[in-house]
């Protein structure tokens, strides 16, 4: 063995026990290209609407944005391997479905003179994860309201049908823990299917899968060493976010040793022409998970966040919340400049959509802006549109004939003002509200949510009949007659009401 390599190996083993990993290679291995930089652009791939969820403005999150400041550091060439992100199904996402439990209720209230009010309500029925699979399910297209049952001079006669039905929904799987990640889950994650969502009557279920233990392809990059302490502080490769190594440690996963980086990625690094495998002290715990599972402030030691871009995003977020509206330009501020699995956002038909999808580095955009070439590829491909049209893409990309890319458009002297077009944001609807019913006449049907006592839910349908009788004298005579001669009006016990309730009301 080369005496130099033997010396470095001893140095690494000794220093790692005390100070963390240190490196002091020979001068001949210093890189001529130590600077790391962001790609021209990033864009999601394989991210259809089924992998997205509607979110409110407060749920938007600005991405981490890192600088390439390397003062006081020396870069050395290295080969970096990462655990392949995926599972035995061959995708970072898991196909699944929402299971809904909803009561479809038709209520009839009949007045003395025959006037009727027909109300149609969707009532949440609490669904526990253990119930999933016990009952047969149907599809949303098979839902319908039962026919009204009306009784003369009687309020609130209910006719109920309870449905268990499914709607398609894909979520991101954590390849390390096999957990599931989605903004609809409580705390945004779930360890095992079936998973409870924010809505009491909606549960998600999907395939469990097994961990993917294959090693990803080798990529060329650099490790950065502090000139004074000789500590290894980070590793970089074009087309990837930087890996912080200030708190790095060794952990065993899938039967192999890995470096757990500051934010939880598992990687392996070779340097000195592949002769030496970078190693750190053993981790004090066995925590593994998707990027960001560890301390969010770990990168602040060296990989300083680009404050200007971060502040622009925070200002955009504040404006979206304050105005309850969004423009393509404002939404572009939420695009992560680093490839990999990232939060992605799109705007469509009054709603903001969020998902976690793979984004790729883009080296070149065609002159007509209709296609792009991703890093380490030669073919140009079209932009992905999650909603099947050519107008709306991710992070503000929009346009029919010539796509408008706000992040690039802002540098053009005569920029397209369409990126400033405002879209008012609607409230996020309940996922179980399916405007599907068996009525042929939908005139005057409205939808409302009942959170408390509502006068509109009472039976006022006899007023049109009274107005046709000729005025106040007849009304007074009628009241006197009812008071003196009629028996007490029968009443029906009110059925227990779940909250919230959605009403589709039509007055007859």
From Swiss-Prot:
Alphabetical GO biological process terms: symbiont entry into host cell; virion attachment to host cell
Main location: virion
Pfam families on file: Rhabdo_glycop_CD, Rhabdo_glycop_FD
Entry comment on modification after translation: Glycosylated by host. Glycosylation is crucial for glycoprotein export at the cell surface.
Transmembrane parts of this sequence: 462-482
Ranges of the Virion surface topological domain: 21-461
Membrane topology summary: Single-pass type I membrane protein
Effect of mutating residue 71 to Q: In strain: Isolate 8401H and Isolate 8601H
Compartment(s): Virion membrane
Membrane-side (Intravirion) residue stretches: 483-508
InterPro entries per record: Rhabdo_glycop_CD, Rhabdo_glycop_FD, Spike_prot
Signal peptide: 1-20
Taxonomic superkingdom: Viruses
Keywords, in A-Z order: Glycoprotein, Host-virus interaction, Membrane, Signal, Transmembrane, Transmembrane helix, Viral attachment to host cell, Viral envelope protein, Virion, Virus entry into host cell
One GO CC term, this protein: viral envelope
UniProt-recorded name of the protein: Glycoprotein
Organism of this sequence: Hirame rhabdovirus (strain Korea/CA 9703/1997) (HIRRV)
Gene this chain is encoded by: G
């Amino acid at each position: 063995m080369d005496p130099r390599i033997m010396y470095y190996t001893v140095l690494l083993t000794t220093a790692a026990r005390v100070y963390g990993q240190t490196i002091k290679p020979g001068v001949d291995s210093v890189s001529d290209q130590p600077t790391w930089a962001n790609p021209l652009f990033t864009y999601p791939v394989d991210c259809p609407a089924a992998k997205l969820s509607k979110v409110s403005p407060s749920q938007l999150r600005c991405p981490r944005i890192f600088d390439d400041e390397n003062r006081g550091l020396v870069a050395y060439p290295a080969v970096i391997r990462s655990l392949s992100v995926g599972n035995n199904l061959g995708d970072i996402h898991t196909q699944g479905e929402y299971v809904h439990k909803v009561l479809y209720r038709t209520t009839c209230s009949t007045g003395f003179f025959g006037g009727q009010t027909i109300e149609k309500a969707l009532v949440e029925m609490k669904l526990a994860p253990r119930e999933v699979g016990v009952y047969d399910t149907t599809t949303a297209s098979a839902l319908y309201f039962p026919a009204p049952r009306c009784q003369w001079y009687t309020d609130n006669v209910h006719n109920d049908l309870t449905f268990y039905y499914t709607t398609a929904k894909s979520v991101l799987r954590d390849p390390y823990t096999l957990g599931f990640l989605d903004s609809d889950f409580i705390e945004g994650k779930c360890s095992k299917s079936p998973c409870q969502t924010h809505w009491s009557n909606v549960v998600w279920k999907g395939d469990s899968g097994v961990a993917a233990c294959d090693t990803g392809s080798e990529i060329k990059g650099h490790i950065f060493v502090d000139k004074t302490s000789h500590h290894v502080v980070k590793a970089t490769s074009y087309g990837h976010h930087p890996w912080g190594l200030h708190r790095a440690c060794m952990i065993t996963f899938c039967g192999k040793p890995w470096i757990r980086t500051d934010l939880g990625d598992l990687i392996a690094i070779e340097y000195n022409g592949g002769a030496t495998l970078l190693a750190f002290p053993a981790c004090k715990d066995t925590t593994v998970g998707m990027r960001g599972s560890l301390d969010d402030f770990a990168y602040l030691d060296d990989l300083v966040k680009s404050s200007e871009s971060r502040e622009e995003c925070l200002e955009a977020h504040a404006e979206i919340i304050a105005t309850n509206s969004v423009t393509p330009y404002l939404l572009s501020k939420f695009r992560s400049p680093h490839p990999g699995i990232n939060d992605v956002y799109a705007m469509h038909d009054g709603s903001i959509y969020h998902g976690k999808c793979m984004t790729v580095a883009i080296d070149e955009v065609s002159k007509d802006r209709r296609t792009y070439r991703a890093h380490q590829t030669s073919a140009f491909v079209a932009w992905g549109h999650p909603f099947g049209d050519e107008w709306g893409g991710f992070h503000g990309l929009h346009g029919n004939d010539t796509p408008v890319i706000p992040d690039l458009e802002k540098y053009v002297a005569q920029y397209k003002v369409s990126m400033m077009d405002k879209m008012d944001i609607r409230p996020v609807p309940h996922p179980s509200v399916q405007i599907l019913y068996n009525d042929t006449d939908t005139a005057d049907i409205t939808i409302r949510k009942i959170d408390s006592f509502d006068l509109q839910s009472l039976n006022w349908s006899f007023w049109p009949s009274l107005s046709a009788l000729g005025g106040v004298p007849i009304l007074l005579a009628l009241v006197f007659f009812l008071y003196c001669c009629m028996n007490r009006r029968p009443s029906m016990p009110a059925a227990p009401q779940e909250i919230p309730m959605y009403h589709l009301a039509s007055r007859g």
